[in-house]
């Protein structure tokens, strides 16, 4: 399944707020519609499916990519669900988003694809690049790169940066301090339901 490029508002109306996909918040429809929906019997499969879709759309990844992350998480030590979230959060495009250098993860991915971003002083143009503690993220020393990202930072750094990251406005430099903990995830998600969804596939 390819990466979603359709209307984002339609997705958040169905799944709830997905800050990585869009900064817009879902507007609830009339109470009569909500009540009729709540009265329907929702299957366990659908509940798991929707949690899985939240991860896919929030992080902007394909079905195949998510399944691959689940397989990696299963082989790692610790809680599969928590490891899965850590893998997704340490993607370069997500780190740029969480630092406030881009308004959304698709926006961060575009910065990476257009070679505006350096990791440890080297240009990295792979959005899925897995960052690690003590990696530092900087902007390519070009006026276009600095202008684009400076505008984003001025606006989006009013939101709190998670504890595992720091950003120096003076140096225009982001630092990954450590692997994040569960409380720092920027998404309302039940990762165990996602693991259960893939239990027969991973």
UniProtKB/Swiss-Prot annotation:
<dbReference type="InterPro" id="IPR022801">
    <property type="entry name" value="Ribosomal_uS4"/>
</dbReference>
<dbReference type="InterPro" id="IPR018079">
    <property type="entry name" value="Ribosomal_uS4_CS"/>
</dbReference>
<feature type="domain" description="S4 RNA-binding">
    <location>
        <begin position="90"/>
        <end position="153"/>
    </location>
</feature>
<protein>
    <recommendedName>
        <fullName>Small ribosomal subunit protein uS4c</fullName>
    </recommendedName>
</protein>
<comment type="function">
    <text>With S5 and S12 plays an important role in translational accuracy.</text>
</comment>
<keyword id="KW-0689">Ribosomal protein</keyword>
<dbReference type="InterPro" id="IPR001912">
    <property type="entry name" value="Ribosomal_uS4_N"/>
</dbReference>
<dbReference type="InterPro" id="IPR005709">
    <property type="entry name" value="Ribosomal_uS4_bac-type"/>
</dbReference>
<keyword id="KW-0699">rRNA-binding</keyword>
<dbReference type="GO" id="GO:0019843">
    <property type="term" value="F:rRNA binding"/>
</dbReference>
<keyword id="KW-0694">RNA-binding</keyword>
<dbReference type="GO" id="GO:0003735">
    <property type="term" value="F:structural constituent of ribosome"/>
</dbReference>
<dbReference type="InterPro" id="IPR002942">
    <property type="entry name" value="S4_RNA-bd"/>
</dbReference>
<dbReference type="Pfam" id="PF01479">
    <property type="entry name" value="S4"/>
</dbReference>
<comment type="similarity">
    <text>Belongs to the universal ribosomal protein uS4 family.</text>
</comment>
<dbReference type="GO" id="GO:0042274">
    <property type="term" value="P:ribosomal small subunit biogenesis"/>
</dbReference>
<keyword id="KW-0687">Ribonucleoprotein</keyword>
<dbReference type="Pfam" id="PF00163">
    <property type="entry name" value="Ribosomal_S4"/>
</dbReference>
<dbReference type="GO" id="GO:0006412">
    <property type="term" value="P:translation"/>
</dbReference>
<keyword id="KW-0934">Plastid</keyword>
<dbReference type="GO" id="GO:0015935">
    <property type="term" value="C:small ribosomal subunit"/>
</dbReference>
<comment type="function">
    <text>One of the primary rRNA binding proteins, it binds directly to 16S rRNA where it nucleates assembly of the body of the 30S subunit.</text>
</comment>
<comment type="subunit">
    <text>Part of the 30S ribosomal subunit. Contacts protein S5. The interaction surface between S4 and S5 is involved in control of translational fidelity.</text>
</comment>
<dbReference type="GO" id="GO:0009507">
    <property type="term" value="C:chloroplast"/>
</dbReference>
<keyword id="KW-0150">Chloroplast</keyword>
<dbReference type="InterPro" id="IPR036986">
    <property type="entry name" value="S4_RNA-bd_sf"/>
</dbReference>
